[in-house]
A protein has these predicted regions:
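Positively charged n-region of N-terminal signal peptides that target proteins for export
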Residues: 1-4
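Bacterial N-terminal signal peptides
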Residues: 7-15
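Extracytoplasmic cell-surface/polysaccharide-interacting catalytic and binding patches
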Residues: 17-89, 188-194
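Catalytic cores and adjacent binding grooves of peptidoglycan-active enzymes
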Residues: 20-25, 40, 124-194
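Sec/Tat-exported extracytoplasmic proteins
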Residues: 48, 92-99, 139, 154
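Stable alpha-helical elements in mature extracytoplasmic
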Residues: 84-91, 100, 142-149
Length: 194
């Protein structure tokens, strides 16, 4: 009976901490990181005071279709894209500080062009040329404050905000735009009513 109680407590604690939608967890990341260089990237985050804005094992997740595409589950963005990493993480930190984006899980970030194509990503995707994150919110979370922020401050941040039919939300700082399920601005959950 004690093990059932412990299991229920652990499950409850996991549920309270946010979303857990991806098998690429801390253990899988630690195994991967043992064979891949991440020190310079981590140091860049520390120097920019952005380390921990997103857990590193989530921040380095490649496409969710990594298995299907026979790619790596994690990837470090090229150094030329690190300024975009910093700006996107600064945006996420601001959204957190304003109470707009408190609980979330990053399920996809940098992707190399080959993996992006295999995973069905857009040609010229911010995931490949700048830095973007796709994230999931808990079922109870209201995504509309993201739209209000985008409408009021998105242009200043050069913020891209999209939502896919799966419920995933895309964030980047690679251009002021929004889109929805069909890829157009008109289908965006942030489109202002006419």
């Amino acid at each position: 009976m004690k093990s059932v109680g412990t299991w229920l407590l652990a499950t409850s604690l996991l549920a309270m901490t946010g979303v857990c939608a991806d098998e690429r967890d801390v253990r899988m990341f630690a195994h991967w990181a043992g064979d891949h260089e991440t020190r310079a990237f981590r140091q860049m985050l520390v120097d920019a005071r952005l380390y921990g804005v997103v857990p590193i094992h989530q921040l380095l997740r490649s496409a969710s279709d990594w298995r299907l595409c026979r790619a790596s589950p994690f990837a470090v963005a090229p150094t030329a894209q690190w300024p975009a990493v910093r700006s996107t993480l600064a945006l996420i930190r601001t959204l957190d500080e304003q109470g707009i984006l408190r609980r979330f899980e990053v399920v996809s970030a940098y992707r190399d062009p080959k993996l992006n194509a295999c995973a069905g990503g857009a040609v010229g995707s911010a995931h490949t040329r700048a830095f973007a994150v796709d994230l999931l919110l808990p079922d109870w979370a209201d995504p509309n404050p993201l739209c209000v922020f985008w409408q009021q401050h998105g242009q200043a941040w050069n913020m891209g905000l999209g939502r896919y039919p799966s419920g995933r939300i895309h964030l980047d700082t690679a251009g002021y735009r929004t889109w929805g399920g069909d890829g157009s601005a008109g289908s965006s959950f942030c489109a202002r009513p006419s």
